[in-house]
Amino acid sequence: MEVRALLKTVRVSSKKASLVANLFRHQSTANAISILKNTNKKSAPIFLKILNSAISNAVNNHGLDASKLYVSNVMVNEGPTLKRFQPHSQGRATRILKRTSHLSVMVSER
């Protein structure tokens, strides 16, 4: 049984979040937690929070054994983009795109 936890509209770009997602996909949960704690990226603590939520959902809501869980899938999708303008010289302005993403972590038993 797959149990998932997701977090939507996180203020991190999907390209940068997918770099971290590739590190702990298909790992055991204990190994994934240690990988995320030692990764120096902005999205690593966000993924750690989602992973802990997925583990808690599996144990409390579905009665699965926490020691047998592994990360079965990690999905990173683009969220809505915030569009801002930065003024420049001679009346010009350039667009700044503040990208967001939707993050999802799925765990299941081996």
Swiss-Prot record:
S-S bridge residues: none
Xref: InterPro entries: Ribosomal_uL22, Ribosomal_uL22_bac/chlpt-type, Ribosomal_uL22_bac/org-type, Ribosomal_uL22_CS, Ribosomal_uL22_sf
Cited CDD domains: Ribosomal_L22 (cd00336)
Database matches in Pfam families: Ribosomal_L22
UniProt cross-references to SUPFAM superfamilies, sorted A to Z: Ribosomal protein L22 (SSF54843)
One annotated Gene Ontology cellular component of this protein: cytosolic large ribosomal subunit
One BP term from GO: translation
Alphabetized GO MF terms: rRNA binding; structural constituent of ribosome
The family this protein is said to belong to: Belongs to the universal ribosomal protein uL22 family.
NCBIfam families to which the protein is assigned, alphabetical: rplV_bact (TIGR01044)
PANTHER family xref list: CHLOROPLAST 50S RIBOSOMAL PROTEIN L22-RELATED, LARGE RIBOSOMAL SUBUNIT PROTEIN UL22M
Record-given protein name: Large ribosomal subunit protein uL22
Organism from which the protein derives: Mycoplasmopsis pulmonis (strain UAB CTIP)
Lineage, broadest ranks: Bacteria, Bacillati, Mycoplasmatota, Mycoplasmoidales, Metamycoplasmataceae
